């Protein structure tokens, strides 16, 4: 095995090798069957790797060097808001009063933690223009489902059982139609117009007495602000439907505009994105949901309330959709988000949006001469390019993404949204310096020139990574998901 190989930890195993040696037993030996029912005892030993501590350290350290995160490099993944997560968040989250408590403790012993949750809810209400917020949902899609279930409960409580359809734009996140389906709705697609915005005439066509809600991201997934949002709200509300805000792109409007003022009835947020809870690797996340007054009765229970200066959970909510998560949400991520909001303040959050939008537009204008710009207008926090020009030269958007790896950059989101051919979606966030943006811009320009002059360099990329291109078809059809001898 050379130093560039990366064996599985099972393949490093040597029979009889141990990581730790225990002292000689100095207490009476106990038969495991005396303390554990035989039904729960394995018939044979688990096939675990036998390795030393040094083997473990080198194995996982080597793997970590191959990983890419916000702390190691630029991560312009569109619609993901991969901003830097301030380390003060981690320090606060590790305070014993936050990290060493248990959700089953008596409320009287965790008043400080409950106060934080209550204050966080109030801050999020102010930021979004909602009347009340629940912190239970564990992530964005979970928040979507929670919000839709409240909308469903509202319609059913009003005897409006025919509202079975949720409208989503053709540029929507894939989680929107998925969440609607899981919540028991049928999805209806509304088209975008030539400007990349929701087509109002098509919206009027699809809205009817069966419409439960319209789900929107604003700005949308193309990075464009839905400038007709007030008219859209009127169209949906006049038909008896509700307007749902997907908070994936809230980073573009912090302290500048509020979903509640745009006419939205329900909002979900991604604290692990906009409010710097670390994300990636599957979690944990936090997807709070805010609602307007008439939907408050349907919030998940229990609801945190303040009575006589004390914080307590109110379980007496007869119209609630019930719990959506055990206990009270992902507390550690909520602590980090609260720390971020209090650290930044209203003016700081406004500056976040201003810099995020400035960075995106700066990059867009610098790259427009080299890549197709489907929507040549002011963008918000992210923007979309198209690799159509390069595709004519035999270089696909996938090739461009692979080539970026050679320069130490994580690729942007590609081939999404689906309504843009050879889509390249870039979100720089506010935390990146001009020097970093310029380095990425220069690299993208170099790749565009390579596509014209030496396309094979891009087509065969990456060249410097340990793992080159995988057989993606084989990986999809014959995945190897577990180790076998």
Curated annotation (Swiss-Prot):
Pfam families for this protein: GcvP2_C, GDC-P
On this chain, the residues bearing N6-(pyridoxal phosphate)lysine are: 273
* Gene Ontology annotations for the cellular component aspect, listed alphabetically: cytosol; glycine cleavage complex
Which E.C. number(s) belong to this protein?
1.4.4.2
Question: Assembly and interactions?
Answer: The glycine cleavage system is composed of four proteins: P, T, L and H. In this organism, the P 'protein' is a heterodimer of two subunits.
Protein family per UniProt: Belongs to the GcvP family. C-terminal subunit subfamily.
HAMAP family the record matches:
GcvPB (MF_00713)
Summary of the function given for this chain in its UniProt record: The glycine cleavage system catalyzes the degradation of glycine. The P protein binds the alpha-amino group of glycine through its pyridoxal phosphate cofactor; CO(2) is released and the remaining methylamine moiety is then transferred to the lipoamide cofactor of the H protein.
Q: What is this protein called?
A: Probable glycine dehydrogenase (decarboxylating) subunit 2
- The organism is Bacillus licheniformis (strain ATCC 14580 / DSM 13 / JCM 2505 / CCUG 7422 / NBRC 12200 / NCIMB 9375 / NCTC 10341 / NRRL NRS-1264 / Gibson 46)
């Amino acid at each position: 095995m050379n130093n560039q190989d990366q064996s599985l930890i099972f393949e490093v195993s040597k029979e009889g090798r141990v990581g730790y040696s225990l002292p000689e037993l100095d207490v009476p030996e106990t038969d495991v069957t005396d303390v554990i029912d035989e039904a729960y005892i394995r018939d044979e030993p688990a096939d675990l790797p036998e390795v030393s501590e040094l083997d473990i350290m080198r194995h996982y350290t080597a793997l970590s060097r191959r990983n890419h995160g916000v702390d190691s490099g630029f991560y312009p993944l569109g619609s993901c808001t991969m901003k830097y997560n301030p380390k003060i968040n981690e320090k606060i989250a590790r305070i014993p009063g936050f990290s060493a408590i248990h959700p089953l403790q008596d409320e009287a012993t965790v008043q400080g933690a409950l106060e934080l949750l209550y204050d966080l809810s109030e801050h999020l209400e102010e930021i979004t223009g909602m009347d009340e917020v629940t912190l239970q949902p564990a992530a964005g899609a979970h928040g979507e489902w929670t919000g839709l279930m409240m909308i469903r409960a509202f319609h059913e409580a009003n005897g409006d059982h025919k509202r079975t359809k949720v409208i989503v734009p053709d540029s929507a996140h894939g989680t929107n139609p998925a969440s609607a389906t899981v919540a028991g709705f049928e999805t209806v697609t509304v088209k975008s117009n030539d400007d990349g915005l929701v087509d109002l005439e098509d919206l009027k066509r699809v809205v009817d007495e069966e419409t439960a809600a319209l789900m929107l991201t604003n700005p949308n997934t193309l990075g464009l602000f839905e400038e007709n949002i007030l008219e859209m709200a009127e169209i949906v509300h006049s038909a008896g439907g509700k307007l749902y805000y997907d908070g994936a792109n809230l980073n573009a409007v912090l302290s500048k505009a509020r979903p509640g003022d745009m006419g939205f009835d329900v909002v979900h947020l991604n604290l692990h994105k906009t409010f710097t809870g670390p994300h990636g690797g599957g979690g944990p996340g936090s997807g709070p949901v805010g609602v307007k007054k008439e939907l408050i009765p349907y919030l998940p229970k229990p609801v945190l309330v303040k009575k006589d200066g004390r914080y307590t959970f109110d379980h007496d909510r007869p119209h609630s959709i019930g719990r959506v998560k055990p206990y009270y949400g992902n507390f550690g991520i909520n602590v980090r988000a609260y720390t971020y909001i209090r650290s930044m303040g209203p003016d700081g959050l406004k500056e976040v949006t201003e810099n995020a939008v400035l960075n995106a537009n700066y990059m867009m204008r610098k790259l427009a001469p080299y890549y197709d710009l489907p929507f040549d207008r002011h963008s918000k926090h992210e923007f979309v390019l198209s690799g159509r020009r390069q595709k004519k030269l035999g270089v696909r958007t996938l090739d461009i993404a692979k080539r970026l790896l050679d320069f130490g950059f994580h690729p942007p989101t590609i081939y999404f949204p689906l309504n843009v051919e050879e889509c390249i979606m870039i979100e720089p966030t506010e935390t990146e310096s001009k020097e970093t943006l310029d380095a990425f811009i220069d690299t993208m320009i170099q790749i565009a020139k390579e596509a014209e002059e030496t396309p094979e360099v891009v087509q065969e990329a990456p060249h410097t990574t340990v793992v080159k291109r995988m057989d993606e078809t084989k990986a999809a059809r014959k995945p190897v998901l577990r180790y076998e001898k």
